[in-house]
Every structure is written in structure tokens, then in C-alpha cells.
Design a protein with these regions (language model features):
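ATP-dependent carboxylate activation and anion-phosphoryl transfer catalytic cores
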Residues: 28-30, 39-43, 53-59, 65-112
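Active-site nucleotide/adenylate-binding loops and adjacent lid/helix of ATP-dependent enzymes
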Residues: 1-60
Length: 112
């Protein structure tokens, strides 16, 4: 699933959706917040911690997608791609939709 994303909140045309503001350089849920275009409100995402280091590279706004909840856990799949080659995936889950530093993580790598 590819979600709409913008480098500036001023480029967002969908005023009804909630947007996730994330640092372009970030780590494990740091500095993640939610943004509502219709009223200009921005609020911290549950599970996110703030680090001044990740404020430096700028932010991206991505349309929020509700993750499924399985027995109180929110799973997420991340991928590693080098050039145009898929190299692995990581399965991560946490008690909040924003995965943090202590979330469960299982890496997988691809071998030919």
C-alpha cells in the first residue's frame, strides 16, 4: 500500500484525513506526531519520544493508515532494498501504533 506523502503540510489537499508527521531521518518512532489539516492541529503520537537530533533533517507528512490490532499488538513490516534488489524485511510490533525502541523485532534476510 502506497500512501500519499508530502514534504510540506501546505501541499496537502485532503483536508479530512489525519496525517502522520515523521522526520526524514528518524529512528524507531522518535518525533512522530499527527496533523489535522482541517483545523491545523498537531499532536504527539502515542508511543513516540522526542529527540532534538531528529528535528534537523526536516519532516514528511504521510496520510495516516490504521494498523490492525492483534491481541493488543500493532504489527508493521519494514523492507530493506539496496538499489533495485530486495534484501530483507523486518517484522516489528508494539503496544502502540508507533513502534518504539523496545518493540518486538524479527529480522529476515533474503538469500539467493
Amino acid at each position: 500500500l502506497l500512501l500519499p506523502a508530502y514534504f510540506s503540510k501546505h501541499d496537502i489537499t485532503d483536508r479530512q484525513s489525519i496525517w502522520v508527521k515523521k522526520p526524514t531521518l528518524g529512528r524507531e518512532g522518535a518525533n512522530v506526531s499527527y496533523y489535522e489539516k482541517r483545523n491545523g492541529l498537531e499532536f504527539a503520537a502515542k508511543g513516540s519520544e522526542h529527540s532534538a537530533f531528529y528535528d534537523q533533517a526536516g519532516y514528511i507528512y504521510q496520510q495516516k493508515f490504521e494498523l490492525p490490532n492483534f491481541d493488543g499488538m500493532y504489527p508493521m513490516i519494514g523492507s530493506w532494498v539496496v538499489g533495485d534488489v530486495a534484501c530483507g524485511i523486518g517484522l516489528r510490533e508494539d503496544f502502540t501504533p508507533v513502534t518504539g525502541n523496545d518493540s518486538h523485532f524479527i529480522p529476515h534476510y533474503f538469500v539467493e
